[in-house]
Design a protein with these regions (language model features):
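Generic detection of long, well-ordered alpha-helical segments
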Residues: 12-16, 82, 90, 130
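Active-site-proximal specificity loops/subdomain of glycosyltransferases
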Residues: 35-73
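GT-A fold catalytic core of metal-dependent nucleotide-sugar glycosyltransferases
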Residues: 66-117, 141
Length: 241
C-alpha cells in the first residue's frame, strides 16, 4: 500500500476544497486505487496527538512544516509521497512510486530552477521571494527507510530545525536527491506548455481572490460541483483579508 499525504489547510473554505480537488484528481487518474491510501495531513491533529510542537508562525500554510513529519508518521518504512493541496493531478500517481524511487535516494522531487518569482504574491498574500530550492518541497517522495532520513529527519528535527534546513533538504546529501521531471510539478504561469502531469497553482488557484481566471483554472473547476463553486465565491468575498 502506497501512502500519499496531502497537506491540509483549514483556514477557509477555499483551502479546504483545494484539498478535496487534489484528492479527487489523484483518485480519478490512478490506475489502481486499491494500491494507495490518501491521508489528510492536518496540523491540528498532530498538535492534539502531542507530535507538533513548533511555535513559529511564519508558514504560508498549515502544512509548511507538517510535511516533514511524514517519515515519522510512516514509521520510517517504505516510500511515501507528500504533496501540497494546490495540485491538480492529470496522471497516474503510481508512476512516481514505480519510476522515480530507488534505495540510494533519500527523497525525490522536481528540482525547480526558476528565479522569476519576485514581485508576485504567495497564496496567503505574502510576497513571493526567490531562494535556493524554492518549491522543491511542494512534492516529495520520501524514502522513509533511508539512513539519513531515519537519522536526521526525526520528530525532534521536524519540530526544532529551521525552515531553511528543512525545505532546502539539508537533512540529506545533494546526491541523494533524485530528480523528477518538472511536468509532475508544473508551476502554473512559470513554465511553457509541456506534457503536464500535475498542475501546481503555486501563486493561487481558482479559490483565491484575483485568481478566479488563472491559467488552467478551468481544469480545476471541472472537479467541483455548482454548489461548491457558489461556496468558493462566498469564501473569496468573505474569508480573505
Amino acid at each position: 500500500m502506497y501512502k500519499i499525504y496531502i497537506g491540509f489547510d483549514s483556514s477557509n473554505y477555499g483551502q479546504q476544497i483545494a484539498w478535496e480537488v487534489c484528492e479527487r484528481s489523484i483518485l480519478r487518474n490512478c490506475s489502481d486505487v486499491s494500491q494507495i491510501e490518501i491521508i489528510k495531513l492536518e496540523k491540528k491533529k498532530l498538535i492534539d496527538q502531542g507530535l507538533f510542537k513548533r511555535t513559529d508562525n511564519d508558514g504560508a500554510t498549515e502544512f509548511t512544516y507538517t510535511r516533514f513529519f511524514v517519515p515519522y508518521l510512516n514509521n520510517y518504512k517504505g516510500h511515501a509521497i507528500f504533496v501540497d493541496s494546490d495540485f491538480l493531478w492529470e496522471c497516474d500517481i503510481l508512476d512516481l512510486f514505480k519510476i522515480y524511487t530507488n534505495p540510494n535516494s533519500a527523497v525525490s522531487c522536481v528540482k525547480h530552477a526558476y528565479t522569476n518569482c519576485n514581485g508576485k504574491k504567495k497564496m496567503d498574500g505574502q510576497a513571493q521571494e526567490w531562494y535556493p530550492k524554492k518549491n522543491w518541497s511542494s512534492l516529495m517522495i520520501f524514502n522513509c527507510e533511508h539512513p539519513n532520513v531515519v537519522k536526521n529527519l526525526t520528530l525532534k528535527a521536524a519540530n526544532t530545525k529551521t525552515p531553511k534546513w528543512l525545505h532546502r533538504m539539508e537533512w540529506c546529501q545533494e546526491e541523494e536527491i533524485l530528480e523528477i521531471p518538472k511536468d509532475y510539478n508544473y508551476l502554473v504561469d512559470y513554465y511553457d506548455e509541456g506534457d503536464i502531469k500535475a498542475l501546481h497553482y503555486t501563486d493561487g488557484g481558482p479559490w483565491h481572490p484575483g485568481y478566479e481566471n488563472v491559467t488552467y483554472g478551468d481544469r480545476w473547476l471541472k472537479y467541483i460541483s455548482e454548489d461548491e463553486k457558489k461556496k468558493i465565491k462566498w469564501s473569496i468575498e468573505n474569508e480573505y483579508n
